[in-house]
Amino acid sequence: MTAPSQVLKIRRPDDWHVHLRDGDMLKTVVPYTSEIYGRAIVMPNLAPPVTTVDAAIAYRQRILDAVPAGHDFTPLMTCYLTDTLDPDELERGFREGVFTAAKLYPANATTNSSHGVTSVDTIMPVLERMEKLGMPLLVHGEVTHADIDIFDREARFIETVMEPLRQRLTALKVVFEHITTKDAAEYVRDGNELLAATITPQHLMFNRNHMLVGGIRPHLYCLPILKRNVHQQALRELVASGFSRAFLGTDSAPHARHRKETSCGCAGCFNAPTALGSYATVFEEMNALAHFEAFCSLNGPRFYGLSVNETYVELVREEQLVPESITLADDSLVPFLGGERVRWSVK
């Protein structure tokens, strides 16, 4: 006789960092997020990027059109900051409830970021307006200078960009997104109530050895890149401590299989189908399941000043096999942990 499965019931979570793409890709991936999460902060790095209120409204509608009947899901839209963005347009979007936050991509830091900001000084009028409005700034925290080693770009960003910015605009709300280093974990932990962080499942579960030892695993390649074990452990310890300003942000970033498994593959993990169970596995390994619901469902709304979701989801602890691939128009998607057996999954 098998032992009864363990069930975890938590308030419905939100995903505070997701890429839903557009077109056929959007139609394929949206249901994996809308089935589980009540809300999601949607990244604006389309081609062209979402820089106007009208573009955000149109994109939001395309997302909603892809949500299956029976899913109760609200996309929270963001504005892509550029060197030439009009502060009045940003303010209008925020006041009208179209923009929840604005996203700072250093130019060329990641996928579709060539329109990103070349220097924080260039967009200071926009950031000052955001500070005045109480509008959160979401930051991809990496410098992009060619002479900086890719494994050092996050730590260098803290000292050269993030800290000077927060010293200059002391009332600005900042989310340090997808943190990957001990440096960032300590920086956010020691910061004030205006600084928070999202953490992905892959950066909690894996380090660069998993991606590079015994063969290159392209489906673990994302930006910021996986770091040393010491950094992975610092992230795990931060979430296991019950720290209240760290919350779930999958950074689910789908690319067609042929764009990942190639001589110059794209960065991003499509983890929407498996992320919640992956987080549960980490919290269980750290003997921290008591803090799991807060990380997934409570800390994010608190930081954003939003109410928590009224419904609940259940995860079951029984081994399940993750599909090796998901059909995508004339290609396929490989989900995070595809072809592997996982311990926790959404019931």
UniProtKB/Swiss-Prot annotation:
Binding site residues for Zn(2+) 1: 17, 19, 103, 251
Listed pathway(s): Pyrimidine metabolism; UMP biosynthesis via de novo pathway; (S)-dihydroorotate from bicarbonate: step 3/3
Cofactor(s) it depends on: Zn(2+)
GO BP terms, alphabetized: 'de novo' pyrimidine nucleobase biosynthetic process; 'de novo' UMP biosynthetic process
Reactions mediated catalytically: (S)-dihydroorotate + H2O = N-carbamoyl-L-aspartate + H(+)
Domain of life according to the entry: Bacteria
Binding positions (Zn(2+) 2): 103, 140, 178
GO molecular function: dihydroorotase activity; zinc ion binding
Coiled coil: none
Residues at the active site: 251
PROSITE patterns: DIHYDROOROTASE_1 (PS00482), DIHYDROOROTASE_2 (PS00483)
Cofactor binding mode and count: Binds 2 Zn(2+) ions per subunit.
Protein biosynthesis as UniProt keyword: no
Purpose of the protein: Catalyzes the reversible cyclization of carbamoyl aspartate to dihydroorotate.
NCBIfam families hit by this protein: pyrC_dimer
Subunit structure: Homodimer.
Name of the protein: Dihydroorotase
Taxonomic source organism: Citrobacter koseri (strain ATCC BAA-895 / CDC 4225-83 / SGSC4696)
